Swiss-Prot record:
Outcome of gene disruption: Constitutive RPW8-mediated HR-like cell death characterized by salicylic acid (SA) accumulation, enhanced transcription of RPW8 and RPW8-dependent spontaneous HR-like cell death (SHL) in leaf tissues. Reduced plant stature. Sphingolipid (e.g. ceramides and hydroxyceramides) accumulation associated with a reduced inositol-phosphorylceramide synthase (IPCS) activity.
Name of the protein this chain belongs to: Phosphatidylinositol:ceramide inositolphosphotransferase 2
Inducing factors: By powdery mildew (e.g. Golovinomyces cichoracearum and Pseudomonas syringae) inoculation.
Protein role: Catalyzes the transfer of the phosphorylinositol group from phosphatidylinositol (PI) to phytoceramide, an essential step in sphingolipid biosynthesis. May play an important role in modulating plant programmed cell death (PCD) associated with defense (e.g. toward Golovinomyces cichoracearum) by promoting sphingolipid metabolism and thus regulating ceramide accumulation.
Lineage of source species: Eukaryota, Viridiplantae, Streptophyta, Embryophyta, Tracheophyta
Organism: Arabidopsis thaliana
Reactions performed catalytically: an N-(2R-hydroxy-very-long-chain fatty acyl)-(R)-4-hydroxysphingoid base + a 1,2-diacyl-sn-glycero-3-phospho-(1D-myo-inositol) = a 1D-myo-inositol-1-phospho-N-[(R)-2-hydroxy-very-long-chain fatty acyl]-(R)-4-hydroxysphingoid base + a 1,2-diacyl-sn-glycerol
Membrane topology: Multi-pass membrane protein
Pathway connected to this protein: Sphingolipid metabolism
Location of this chain's protein in the cell: Golgi apparatus, trans-Golgi network membrane
Gene Ontology molecular-function annotations: inositol phosphoceramide synthase activity; phosphotransferase activity, for other substituted phosphate groups
Amino acid sequence: MTLYIRRESSKLWKRFCSEISTEIGLLAENWKYLLAGLICQYIHGLAAKGVHYIHRPGPTLQDLGFFLLPELGQERSYISETVFTSVFLSFFLWTFHPFILKTKKIYTVLIWCRVLAFLVACQFLRVITFYSTQLPGPNYHCREGSKVSRLPWPKSALEVLEINPHGVMYGCGDLIFSSHMIFTLVFVRTYQKYGTKRFIKLFGWLTAIVQSLLIIASRKHYSVDVVVAWYTVNLVVFCLDKKLPELPDRTAVLLPVISKDRTKEENHKLLNGNGVDPADWRPRAQVNGKIDSNGVHTDNTMNGA
């Protein structure tokens, strides 16, 4: 048992080191895209904070989702955040599975370049929409009478550039469309294309639907915020996926051609005339019952022979 553990540990360590060297090479080539994506995440956070300064609380708008779904209440608002955190962490860990598992289909650096491109495009559209029209927030801390429904004006430029972690849960004004649904749908669609487990793919879409209902039931967004996110994110990912270069497929490395299959392939080529040198098909002349490979007629009586 100890010998088996040592052998497997050695294999795992070699696999990890090999993957590290591969990913470092990819990181050296693509670090600019990753850095740009992270900077855009920061800018998106600043934009969401900025709209909180100009948010004006008011009566909650009439909403079909609020009418159909019972309100969870402020004490149960953590449920949707728990589901989102589970989705985020699960996807994050999955992108690093090539470092551990033997079967792998993606490169970690390349998959995150692709994911960040999807996120940035969707967030750019989101910033445009929630700055175009500010709706009164339906969340409990955004309603009339709440002390945090509107941020006090900043006293310095440094305060504007600071990102408050609590703004993720206690922001107001950044409604159309839901940022949580952007991340959730991008992650689910990415695994749908590059994942290998069908059960997890189905479970991912089911989780996205449940997440949508929980967001509305928690009164964190209007129904329109969730609906717009569903078709906008899917359309953006669909269009960008056609434009971005496809990731190299790693599964071919795990499927070497065995000798039996190679023999069948060679026989198939021979039957179709593809496995023979084209030079062997050129016309040849017959000389005294013999074939001259150069196609030139030779006479054995020439030169008195």
